[in-house]
Structure formats: structure tokens, C-alpha cells
Amino acid sequence: MIPQAYISEWYQQVPWQTMEQVEQDLVICRALVEIFSDDLLANSLALRGGTALHKLFFSPQQRYSEDIDLVQITAEPFGPLVDRIRERLAFLGEPKRSPKANDFTMYFRFESEFPPIMNLRLKVETNTREHFTVSELIKIPFEVNSQWFMGSCNLTTYKFGGIIGNQAAGIVPTQKRP
């Protein structure tokens, strides 16, 4: 999908050790620009999770990300958003879809370009129920500058404290109250 020369070029911009990680990082970055360059998606979804934390608030990134975690910030039917995400990420092919009560996940699969050929995956998971937020939404400029893809957008996300709080809530076990 991505010529090896462009993956090697991206290797100079990211701290990852394997070419598969570099390739997947470039795919994630393009996917973010594709999603948040679309007005409907940018006004209906917010980026959160480890990818938001490490791509937007730490330089250089401290942790490798394999997925995109989104939250639907508007109470509206999700079907049109799924269709639009699929359109924007058409360069990845047709996703496997996994709808659940509170989220909708799309799995895009592709093969790495450098031998040994490996199956890579991009998971785009959207929480479809948390429309209310205490943490203020913000827009953060984001760009990809590669010979394979160039683009920029303003990512809709949460302030640093909101992302950290969400990450902490995800790792603290839920205790049942008596």
C-alpha cells in the first residue's frame, strides 16, 4: 500500500524501532487527517485515548499506538458517521465491523511492505453513548508531511486533564458498592 521509500522517510520522524510500527504509524496519522478533515466527522467525533495523549501532548511520543479511539460527542444516529468514516478511510479497504451496545468498532487489515510480510491492523473504535463531557473540547492542529500523503486538520479532542482522567478511569478496576 505504501512504497517502502516513503515508510523509510517516515522512519526519520518517529521513534519506532520496526518498519511495521513506522508503517502503521503513518497509516494512523493519515487516518486521523482523513477523519478530522471532514466537517461532519470533526463536529461529531472527538479523539481520545492513548493515541490522542501521545500524538498530541508528548513530543517525542512516549508510547506506540495501534488504534484510534473516538467518542461520539453529538446525540445523533451513528449510521451516517460509519458510512462517512468508511468513505474517508477507503484507502484501507473494507473494514470488518463490530457493533456493540455502547461502541462501534471497525477493523482495517493490511499487509506490511517490508519483509517479513506481516498482517497489520488499524482499529477505529467509537464510543457511541458518552455524549456529555465535563472536560472542555478543544481543537489541536495536526499534520502529516510525507511523500505518500500530505494533509492537515484540527483534531477535536479533550484538554490534557480530560484525556488523562479517561485513561486513569480505564485502568482502575471498577469496584462494586455494597
Language model: regions and residue ranges:
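Catalytic micro-motifs at enzyme active sites that drive phosphoryl/nucleotidyl and oxygen chemistry
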Residues: F58-P60, P95-P99, R109-P115
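Metal-dependent nucleotidyltransferase catalytic core
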Residues: Q72-M106
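Generic non-transmembrane alpha-helical segments
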Residues: A31-L41, R84, R88-L92
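Active-site nucleotide-donor binding segment shared across nucleotidyl transfer reactions
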Residues: F36-I68, I73
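Hydrophobic (often cysteine-bearing) scaffold residues that line and stabilize catalytic clefts
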Residues: E20, Q24, L81
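Terminal (often C-terminal) interaction modules
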Residues: M1-W10
